[in-house]
Amino acid sequence: MSEPVGRAVLIAGPTASGKSGLALALAEKLGGEIVNADSMQLYREMRVLTARPSEEEEARVPHHLYGVTAASAPLSAGRWAVLAAEKMREIAARGRLPVVVGGTGLYFRALIEGLAPIPAIPDDVRAAVRAEVGDAGPHAHALLAEADPALAATIRPSDLQRIARGIEVARATGRPLSAWQQIPPEPLVSGTFAKIMLMPDRAWLQARCDRRFDLMLEEGALEEAAAMTALGLDPALPAAKALGLRPLMRHLAGEITLEEAAAAGKAETRAYAKRQETWLRTQMIAWKGFSTQHSESLNAEILSFIDDLGLTRS
């Protein structure tokens, strides 16, 4: 059952679109606290590689759910939504405004629309399935097709993470994930929400992706990649797929030059931003889109939108 949080600002958008800067500006203006809705910024080992707010920015207003889990311990969308809902209620109880920001659309969906009530998967089942899927490689999709044909029809053979999820749910619960997904979900929170989606010009966004990757290299991305390499993570883990991480690891292994790694990292980031744009436009059509770049004029436009909804403080 959803619990009311009164009012909140939700900010979505592709990577490098200026979400974090906007969230900080709004939180300072409206007496808010920021809640992270970016799946990669949950990991404590990758502040630079995931473009988490800096320590200086985090000191300006309270930030929640940043760097809260290890790269080896990913959080599901459902688990994140539970944590985010708790933070939103705590923030509202203090008389402040929750500002939830990130580019992981599924997280927002889990929070305000709900997800299927799938039981927790035992660790031994999860570990066994992940090992089996890893060993099967390109044949893993066939394993899913046996366990859940309907789900298999919607998943690419290369998406081992989702393949493993489908298999583990079927084995642990005796019911296919596709069947669980037919159960009407319940949102975790309710209230008056300003749903903001940043969609800047694509050429501007792609140039910003490139500049941001260069800045990451200056701020220590290579050192973070070295630390991640030392962890010896399973490459199937979500954290191992952080944008630019694999090219930098290849450079550290002597396989490619730093220039080649940077070019590959930038290409990954641009491609991901494009996929995010497509997903957000098609899956979050009820959100208010803002197509201009982050600026003072955009802030004023968004503040007007928030004020029209009655969310600004008196």
Swiss-Prot record:
What UniProt keywords are attached to this protein's entry? Answer: ATP-binding, Magnesium, Nucleotide-binding, Transferase, tRNA processing
Superkingdom of this entry's organism? Bacteria
Q: Where is this site: Interaction with substrate tRNA?
A: 104, 126
A single Gene Ontology biological process assigned to it is:
tRNA modification
Reported cofactor(s): Mg(2+)
Q: What Gene Ontology molecular function terms does this protein carry?
A: ATP binding; tRNA dimethylallyltransferase activity
Pfam families assigned to the protein according to its UniProt record, in alphabetical order: IPPT
Q: Which residues form a coiled coil?
A: none
Q: Does the keyword Transferase apply?
A: yes
Q: Which reaction does it catalyse?
A: adenosine(37) in tRNA + dimethylallyl diphosphate = N(6)-dimethylallyladenosine(37) in tRNA + diphosphate
The record's annotation in InterPro entries points to: Dimethylallyltransferase (IPR039657), IPT (IPR018022), P-loop_NTPase (IPR027417)
Residue positions binding ATP: 13-20
Q: What is its EC number?
A: 2.5.1.75
| Binding-site positions, substrate | 15-20
Q: Annotated region Interaction with substrate tRNA: where?
A: 38-41, 161-165
Q: How does it assemble?
A: Monomer.
Q: What is the similarity comment for this entry?
A: Belongs to the IPP transferase family.
PANTHER family linked to this entry: TRNA DIMETHYLALLYLTRANSFERASE
- Function, in words: Catalyzes the transfer of a dimethylallyl group onto the adenine at position 37 in tRNAs that read codons beginning with uridine, leading to the formation of N6-(dimethylallyl)adenosine (i(6)A).
Q: What is this protein called?
A: tRNA dimethylallyltransferase
Please give the organism.
Parvibaculum lavamentivorans (strain DS-1 / DSM 13023 / NCIMB 13966)
